[in-house]
């Protein structure tokens, strides 16, 4: 098993989208070598903040998607109209690099307060194949 890398608190790899007048900041936290590297998000009514972290963070983490070091990616809308998040994971349980790519469908649900809740369709993680 890879020793769990220790570092100062880190937030990096930001992506900001605006849905129905609210800004959503997706970010990665922890160091990429840490097995708990993960993705969370925060919301704000202004791109300058203040930002409010979502209470159900992280949305992508080894406990959710089943692989160490699951973080630092980007959001995109697929041809099917769904949102997806592409990210990387550790190579194996014993090696961080070279990292591998994963894509997970997002489940985006609008709450009564007008704020979208974002979770992942963890049973449908896409594992790209390379030729």
Annotate the PLM regions.
Residues 1-131:
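Carbohydrate-active catalytic/glycan-binding domains of CAZyme proteins
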